[in-house]
Amino acid sequence: MSLQISILTPEKPFWNGQAEEIILPTETGEMGVLKNHAPIITGLDVGAMLVRTKEEWNSYALMGGFAVVKKNKVTILANEAESAETIDAEEAKNAFEIAKGNLEKAEGVKQKVEANFAYKRAKARFQVVKVVNKYS
């Protein structure tokens, strides 16, 4: 038996399916989940999530949230989620470069916090595109 994965966003159920493995961007680093994983609830950071089905790896950009792992079911409650296939590679690369520059130029606490969030978001989108498209 494999893992049953459900990814939910405020707008709609984003993805449901079976997977052999999932790698989550938690607030303390990446966390891999295989079948028979110990039960856990964890916060998700903005970052790339990888899902391995029997056929392939799929990548998604998550914009924070929570994950619940219990009895071979993984439920992800994400603020936002995007599939790599729906992200334009050039736009993601340009947005990443702009966000990186804005973070380096940010002054003051508010501007640094906003620039850091924009950077993490752009980095997540660019990372998932690179995984799928081998873009660099």
Swiss-Prot record:
Topology versus the membrane: Peripheral membrane protein
Keywords, alphabetical: ATP synthesis, CF(1), Chloroplast, Hydrogen ion transport, Ion transport, Membrane, Plastid, Thylakoid, Transport
Subunit architecture: F-type ATPases have 2 components, CF(1) - the catalytic core - and CF(0) - the membrane proton channel. CF(1) has five subunits: alpha(3), beta(3), gamma(1), delta(1), epsilon(1). CF(0) has three main subunits: a, b and c.
Pfam families: ATP-synt_DE, ATP-synt_DE_N
GO MF terms, alphabetically ordered: ATP binding; proton-transporting ATP synthase activity, rotational mechanism
Function text: Produces ATP from ADP in the presence of a proton gradient across the membrane.
InterPro entries: ATP_synth_F1_dsu/esu (IPR001469), ATP_synth_F1_dsu/esu_N (IPR020546), ATP_synth_F1_esu_C (IPR020547), ATPsynth_dsu/esu_N (IPR036771)
Gene label: atpE
NCBIfam families referenced in this protein's UniProt entry, alphabetically: ATP_synt_epsi (TIGR01216)
Protein name: ATP synthase epsilon chain, chloroplastic
Family in the record: Belongs to the ATPase epsilon chain family.
GO cellular component: chloroplast thylakoid membrane; proton-transporting ATP synthase complex
Domain of life of the source: Eukaryota
Location(s), subcellular: Plastid, Chloroplast thylakoid membrane
